[in-house]
Amino acid sequence: MKDFFRMRTAQQPATRHWRHTVAPGGLPLAGHALLMARKPLQFLASLPAHGDLVELRLGPRPVYLPCHPELVQQVLVNARVYDTGGPVKEKAKPILGNGLITSDWADHRRQRRLVQPAFHTARIAKYAEVMERECEAESTAWTARRPIDVSHEMLALTARVTARALFSTDMAPHAVAEIQHCLPIVVEGAYRQAIDPTGLLAKLPLAANRRFDDALARLNQLIDRMIDDYKASDDGDRGDVLSALFAAQDDETGGTMSDQEIHDQVMTLLLAGIETTASALTWAWFLLGRNPGAEAALHAEVDEVLGGRAPRYADVPRLAYTQRVFSEALRLFPPAWLFTRTTTETTELGGRRLPPASDVLISPYVLHRDPALFPRPDSFDPDRWLPERAKEVTRGSYLPFGGGSRKCIGDVFGMTEATLALAAIAGRWRMRPIPGTKIRPRPQMSLTAGPLRMIPEPR
């Protein structure tokens, strides 16, 4: 599967004249904040036509959007100079703690070394046993020709998979239900706080704030209970993520993680690993419903590889078209559609001098929809990821999992989970769109689809 992500480094000239400009449409005082609030995807996708590095104003503060993949790579591979930071990070820390997403550069390196063993290939194979069972359960639970909300079903599936991979396969059903209930509330509330420039919204006595506070407290309590239960048991390595985190030892320092550090990593993995995969799976079903040729190719591969049985981890390498379907859904609707970096020192990007504490926006959505990088960028074409075509994709232009040292640590986990889910469901059902159903991307913490009603028809 890793071969799928190997892409050719585009040949670039030794010197380049970069185009940098200020984005059009800014207003006095507000700058481009209203455009970002009202139509962020359309606005951002229009910017590559104006320059390789585009300056925006969010209120009085300038932020910089690199639109060329070479500049994006420059940011992502230099994590010391372009660190996490800015107001979004500061608002996320009380929710996520000091985990992989929110930690500063120096500490992130240590954390990455400690968490990485939990996602080694041998452990992915163990987690895949959970994926297999849950995907099979999901695919057999539906009633023929009874409409379902695909978004809801995919979120429930990925919540069960992630929770049981984190905390072991015998996790109590009520704990999984607690995660399914609390997680969407926390994600929505975190997004509201992140986009509030004043910081006042979270302090108002609103019902939404009370729901958020309650859901966050319940998630924190659940994680603490799971940690306490593990410490009180004599189970040793149960094959789950929590066991790996407790066993982790830094090769460089010999250090381990405290209970609080493990808590923060678990919270990070819950919030980063459930909604993102669920959103991408929802988009995949939406796209397949609109492209019967791709749906037929998916069914043909599943029938050939599986022969009517449920998919297994060993089948994943042979489900090549299934992987291409998901990768193309990730290109068109990347869950991590926007993230930020902040400079730690004076540096230069695209010929522009950036002082310390300059905010840089990275948008995979912008790159993925750029016709200069992807021909017919708005078309759903899974075969653009055939090996002979994928090798022509410019390095740094496809970033569904980010890049550099902060690339998503669960990328292989997510691809494996999605491949098994698509194969399990496609082996039993044709997912039919309901006529008149309209859906549009919702750019929040991830690029969600909102409710998507479809009709499962037996194959």
UniProtKB/Swiss-Prot annotation:
Question: Which Gene Ontology MF annotations are present?
Answer: heme binding; iron ion binding; monooxygenase activity; oxidoreductase activity, acting on paired donors, with incorporation or reduction of molecular oxygen
Q: Please list the cofactors this protein needs.
A: heme
Q: Output the superkingdom of the source species.
A: Bacteria
> What EC numbers are recorded for this enzyme?
1.14.99.62
Locate the residues binding heme.
Answer: 408
Reactions catalysed, semicolon-separated, are: cyclooctat-9-ene-5,7-diol + AH2 + O2 = cyclooctatin + A + H2O
One Pfam annotation reads p450
For this UniProt record, the keywords arranged alphabetically read as follows: Heme, Iron, Metal-binding, Monooxygenase, Oxidoreductase
Q: Which EC class, in a word?
A: oxidoreductase
Function, in words:
Involved in the biosynthesis of cyclooctatin, a potent inhibitor of lysophospholipase.
Q: Which family does it belong to?
A: Belongs to the cytochrome P450 family.
By what name is this protein known? Cyclooctatin synthase
